[in-house]
Amino acid sequence: MAARLLRGSLRFLGGHCAARPLPALRCSHSGGEERLETPSAKNLTDIGIRRIFSSEHDIFRKSIRKFFQEEVIPHHSEWEKAGEVSREVWEKAGKQGLLGVNIAEHLGGIGGDLYYAAVVWEEQAYSNCSGPGFSVHSGIVMSYITNYGSEEQIKHFIPQMTAGKCIGAIAMTELGAGSDLQGIKTNAKKDGSDWILNGSKVFISNGWLSDVVIVVAVTNHEAPSPARGISLFLVENGMKGFIKGRKLHKMGLKAQDTAELFFEDVRLPASALLGEENKGFYYIMKELPQERLLIADMAVSASEFMFEETRNYVKQRKAFGKTVAHLQTVQHKLAELKTHICVTRAFVDNCLQLHEAKRLDSATACMAKYWASELQNSVAYDCVQLHGGWGYMWEYPIAKAYVDARVQPIYGGTNEIMKELIAREIVFDK
């Protein structure tokens, strides 16, 4: 696996690591002076050493950074206007090995560990390009299929998904059920060996481009509790009665397609059931820690990006005859931001280590998601303020980062719910 990663990364870089100069980066890592630094900030994460990455991860990171520089950043403004990215970039991502990096090689992945996946979503955050829904596709949808799918389902979907030819989405949220998944109304009723699916979903990331959607539906209205009567189904694009509504116009994440989905008497074969009947809520609870960790890592990475943008801006912006960076209030604010970001990075890295060791519990994942997403919004607010009026202009990267940040405390479970779950772990005995 390591040799394949190395060959693939060097091939994308044009045959050798130094094929094209990348931004000068200087933060500390373990393993030697030639290690690739992680964020774009000059000395942002010199909190010691990010020990979770090896030199192989760094080579992989270099190729992923180059991919975003060449295949995503130049097109992102166009995608924002369209409200979706091109399918072409999905297939290019598949060829580069960005999709399902921790999937086994015989299924089209590269057999990497969690840290390879983290490299991909961190580099997307550093690119400030939120359009491609790679993290939902790889970190959430593919995880459900590989963990709970049958051998036939895995063989049918995963190779196409790692190639970027089949785009995945997951449909949980409804008009009357967001964080309260037990309140969903979408239902599936048996008809012989088939299922008949009815209902609707909203705010579905990758919904418009999706080829397969994991749909959360009620399958047993007589269950002792709603949680015991929920199942998951794999619904494919083109099935009769599966209708994609409009692309939703959002405050941020403008290039990421988000859609309404409708299911009107969709006939599903028995093979569309993902996992066991009525076990859907259990599966969701098992997968949510990874989703929340993903959000947390992208949040702190976005914070690192915003800090670097702002640090560079205040060092060249002049006011009162000197650069803004020479004002004590600005210096103190930068000191606060850097400290908060570095502390959060250390916590999130620890959570990544816990998850790789299969020891990340729900409450800790909730803490990471809650804290990092709140930090991201705080950093976004302060960085726009330090940009002054220019921070309110869309052509400045900080403006886009600001509106993209706002949804982070909402999806993956609102931060209010995160606090409830954390408190429950503290107060009540299991």
Swiss-Prot record:
The organism's place on the tree of life at top rank: Eukaryota
Enzyme kind, highest EC tier: oxidoreductase
Positions carrying N6-acetyllysine: K42, K66, K81, K92, K95, K254, K279, K318, K322, K358
CDD domains: LCAD
InterPro entries: Acyl-CoA_dehydrogenase, Acyl-CoA_DH_CS, Acyl-CoA_Oxase/DH_mid-dom, Acyl-CoA_Oxase/DH_mid-dom_sf, AcylCo_DH-like_C, AcylCo_DH/oxidase_C, AcylCoA_DH/ox_N, AcylCoA_DH/ox_N_sf
CC cofactor: FAD
Modification Phosphoserine occurs at: S54, S55, S362
GO cellular component: mitochondrial matrix
Residues the record lists as N6-succinyllysine modifications: K66, K81, K165, K240, K254, K279, K322
Annotated organelle transit peptide span: 1-30
Pfam hit, one: Acyl-CoA_dh_N
Reactions that this protein is recorded to catalyse: a long-chain 2,3-saturated fatty acyl-CoA + oxidized [electron-transfer flavoprotein] + H(+) = a long-chain (2E)-enoyl-CoA + reduced [electron-transfer flavoprotein]; hexanoyl-CoA + oxidized [electron-transfer flavoprotein] + H(+) = (2E)-hexenoyl-CoA + reduced [electron-transfer flavoprotein]; octanoyl-CoA + oxidized [electron-transfer flavoprotein] + H(+) = (2E)-octenoyl-CoA + reduced [electron-transfer flavoprotein]; decanoyl-CoA + oxidized [electron-transfer flavoprotein] + H(+) = (2E)-decenoyl-CoA + reduced [electron-transfer flavoprotein]
Active-site residue list: E291
Entry keyword set: Acetylation, FAD, Fatty acid metabolism, Flavoprotein, Lipid metabolism, Mitochondrion, Oxidoreductase, Phosphoprotein, Transit peptide
Post-translational modification: Acetylation at Lys-318 and Lys-322 in proximity of the cofactor-binding sites strongly reduces catalytic activity. These sites are deacetylated by SIRT3.
Transmembrane intervals: none
Molecular function GO labels: flavin adenine dinucleotide binding; long-chain fatty acyl-CoA dehydrogenase activity; palmitoyl-CoA oxidase activity
EC number annotated for this UniProt entry: 1.3.8.8
Alphabetized SUPFAM superfamilies for the sequence: Acyl-CoA dehydrogenase C-terminal domain-like, Acyl-CoA dehydrogenase NM domain-like
Example of a GO biological process term: carnitine metabolic process, CoA-linked
Pathways per UniProt: Lipid metabolism; mitochondrial fatty acid beta-oxidation
Binding sites annotated in the UniProt record for FAD: 170-179, 203-205, 317, 328, 385-389, 414-416
Protein task: Long-chain specific acyl-CoA dehydrogenase is one of the acyl-CoA dehydrogenases that catalyze the first step of mitochondrial fatty acid beta-oxidation, an aerobic process breaking down fatty acids into acetyl-CoA and allowing the production of energy from fats.
Subunit and interaction comment: Homotetramer.
Family (UniProt): Belongs to the acyl-CoA dehydrogenase family.
Protein name as it appears in the record: Long-chain specific acyl-CoA dehydrogenase, mitochondrial
